[in-house]
Amino acid sequence: MHLRQFLYLTFFLFIPSLLAAQPCREVSAYFPSWKWYNRGQLVNPASIHYEKYTTIIYAFFKPNPDGSISPFDPVADKTLLLGEAAPGIPRAYLGKKDFGNPDWHNDRNSLVKRAHSEGVKVVISVGGWTLSDQFSSIAASAEKRRRFAHSCNEMVRVYGIDGIDIDWEYPGFITNKGSADDKYNFTHLLQAVRDSLDALEFQRGRHLSLSAAFGVAPTRMAEIEWAKVVHLLDHINLMTYDFYGNSFATTNHNAPLYSPEKGLNGYDTHSAVRHLMERYGVPSWKINIGLAFYGRSLKTKGAAGLHVSSRQLPDTKTFPEDGGTPMFRPPT
């Protein structure tokens, strides 16, 4: 999926993820940097209702071939995470793909400053669908893992964030240059980041979280060493959406809570959570389920309906604004 499609189909404005156990302990929300440009910058650090969340996940930073991490959009990333740039800074500064210099920004309206003033944490997510093609080679190299972990610590230092989220889509996924060794190398990568954050925790005197996003198809879950990984992570963020879409020959629910009348076994939120808990022993209090604030539209070969033959194309005529993806927008 290309970046433009990814914007439409996956992380919209905020997609809360709610802990499977009750009562709910964690409500996180993605802040995609590219959405800052939309609708006159309507979604910005000053417009967020922080009281609704415990954590804001800022998406996404880019893993580089050498294992380092860089901003994907340095202008948006520096402005949103550090605040407005001060007058008189070098003209090329904002566009440079480094983490930035906090001394050159007014942090009064930064996402981090605003969130912290409301008791909300901020973490940066590294990767995402279009930025996952370097993870396999990074995870396979001890030197690249070290450099990756060092970059994670630098992001904590520069931005004052509360942790790191890893969004590798997906270990073992050939389309994103995955390999059979990813299952084991992903564990090594998480261990390197956790060890590095632990060392920084000791210096700073506060906990730094580590979370990761996971595909929930049974084949995706099988590519993770859960018994080892679960102890390294504070939160396991399940991508319980995009179960079905235009890659399927028949129409179905995008993000079903329970198993649809027709469809693949295990392709629903309830089954995914039970599978993770019962087969792999993951504790419920670490699991966050993802809620999709969008739907799917599909052109059909005959009459519109559920479980009917699809032309595998979105209905951009009915839903032109977001590439054929109907999505929830609260009144402004």
Whereabouts are the PLM-identified features?
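Mobile, glycine-rich extracellular loop/lid and propeptide segments
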Residues: 123-128, 159-171
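Glycan-recognition patch characteristic of GH18 chitinases/ENGases
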Residues: 22-156
